[in-house]
Amino acid sequence: MEELERIERPSASEGERRAAEWLVGRFAELGAEARIEAEPAHGTYWWPLGIGATLGAIGGILSLRGRRVLGGALAGAAAAGMASDYPPGKRLLRRALPRRTTYNVVCELGPATAERTVVAIAHHDAAHSGLVFHPKLPEIADRLGMIERTDTSPPLMAPVVGGPVLAALGAFTGRRLLTKLGVVLGIGSAAAMAEIGMREVVPGANDNGTAVVSLLALAEQLIEQPPESLRVILLSVGSEESFSEGMKAFGERHFPTLTRESTFFLCLESTGSPHLLVLRGEGFLKMREYPARALALMDGLAEELDVWLYPNLRTRSGTDGLESMAAGYETAVIASCTDLKQPANYHWWHDLAENVDFGTVADGIRLSEATIRRLDERWL
């Protein structure tokens, strides 16, 4: 993990490519063959969201100056484009933006002709920081009693689309106050996105070096004791931090050959906080509940292993598991949290290997292996 965190690896970058090559080499040391699948990706989220927020603010200003139809149409189009940019949407706004290359690492173990497949997912890129991720913010929310009252994380990114929405509503209804609020929120959101874009990349030990080393541990165990009737794909995607572009590309390439009835996706995301958990649901704008059968499997295995799971948490963001769940696959996400129901050191400079709870990482590996072994014995 310390080797990986020393690689500066923003989404769709040369550093991400080096991280992918490093991971392929580590798989090879274990005796597992892995390959890199290069895919087109934009590599940010702050540009499409920032542009959308700016267009929404411009639409609001046009409306306030008497051009309500044009302003409302511009703000509405910006809102629709921004909404599509959140996973698992079609990412319409970024299609007009420059594209780079992202690098997915794929390692296949077990019988190649197996009828059933488990895909274990990590990601090897790392995030930009930003003031919106300041660790003091959850502490303030906790002092205000906001953390205890809810089991769903705050929608950090959803308000960004709120500016264009309010500007459009104000334009079409003639309510100038709504329009003014939309303009202010749009300008503020654009500024926040610009600030994130100017920040450097965090070390990314918990998010998501913990999952990468978990894949390596799983590879070692599966080589030592191969599954009998199950193909296992150990997948580390790039560009997760630019709204799961690597996972979306994997889906476009591989979902047509992975049948929904015989494929299980197991996403590992930031498993180095004090408390292990299995997400109940997630989504930036729309909360999507994870499949009941997948959750029952994970909860039952955790009980058998005597692994305590932090109960009933949902997140108003998106892991790579959101893509496979939205595509109709049985999916589960193993993650972790602090007492404040947040990933430890999330998108901050303290996200170092020295601050990772390796006991939680080990429990996540145990639960992941148990899931694979159980599905090898019998399917859902």
Where are these regions (language model features)?
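N-terminal capping segment at the start of a domain
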Residues: 1-18, 30, 196-200, 270-273, ...
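A non-catalytic alpha/beta surface segment that caps or lines the substrate-entry region
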Residues: 7-112, 131-170, 176-179
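Short, conserved micro-motifs enriched in small and acidic residues
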Residues: 14-18, 202-213, 358-362
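Hydrophobic anchor at the start of a short beta-strand
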Residues: 33-34, 232, 263, 309, ...
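Active-site-adjacent substrate-binding region
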Residues: 38, 271-380
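Acidic/histidine-rich catalytic neighborhood of metal-dependent amide-processing enzymes
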Residues: 84-106, 113-114, 126-131, 170-183, ...
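Short beta-strand element of the alpha/beta-hydrolase
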Residues: 117-122
